[in-house]
């Protein structure tokens, strides 16, 4: 089981990591006012990057609220997301949703992304012998 913390190792931190996901996402999960881009990583845990610009959400209070909600939702659902580098791209209107709506929407988005989860090396090796 993946630990439920959200430490530095579970974040996309440098531009090169974001660029890798933007340049070649293997999964795109659109939602209401948001887009998830994901790419497999070779790690046993997922990593999250957030792109919430001023064009999408004008006030910093709103941007920070969304970041907190998205990070918390990710933290609670990360066991099913192992093996992904994920970038969340906010679109206009996301800041106008209530906290419960944002939380529910991301719960559904994580589930949709988990269904298209890449096989780990262990799973791939096991299925080739069957």
UniProtKB/Swiss-Prot annotation:
> How would you classify this enzyme at the top EC level?
hydrolase
Q: Which UniProt keywords apply?
A: Endonuclease, Hydrolase, Nuclease, RNA-binding, tRNA processing
Question: From the Swiss-Prot or TrEMBL record, what is one GO molecular function term?
Answer: 3'-tRNA processing endoribonuclease activity
Question: InterPro entries annotated for this entry?
Answer: Ribosomal_Su5_D2-typ_SF (IPR020568), Ribsml_uS5_D2-typ_fold_subgr (IPR014721), RNase_P (IPR000100)
Q: Name one Pfam family in it.
A: Ribonuclease_P
Provide one Gene Ontology cellular component.
ribonuclease P complex
Q: Give a yes or no for keyword Signal in this entry.
A: no
Its protein name is Ribonuclease P protein component
Encoding gene, per UniProt annotation: rnpA
């Amino acid at each position: 089981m993946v630990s439920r913390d959200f430490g530095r190792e579970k974040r996309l931190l440098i531009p090169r990591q974001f660029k890798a996901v933007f340049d070649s996402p293997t999964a795109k999960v659109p939602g209401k006012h948001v887009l998830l881009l994901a790419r497999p990583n070779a790690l046993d845990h997922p990593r999250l990057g957030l792109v919430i610009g001023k064009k999408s959400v004008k006030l910093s209070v709103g941007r920070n609220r969304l970041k907190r909600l998205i990070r918390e939702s990710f933290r609670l659902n990360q066991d099913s997301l192992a093996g992904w580098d994920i970038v969340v791209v906010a679109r206009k209107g996301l800041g106008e949703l209530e906290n419960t709506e944002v939380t529910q929407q991301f719960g559904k988005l994580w589930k949709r992304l988990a269904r298209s989860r890449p096989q780990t090396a262990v799973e791939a090796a096991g299925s080739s012998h069957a």
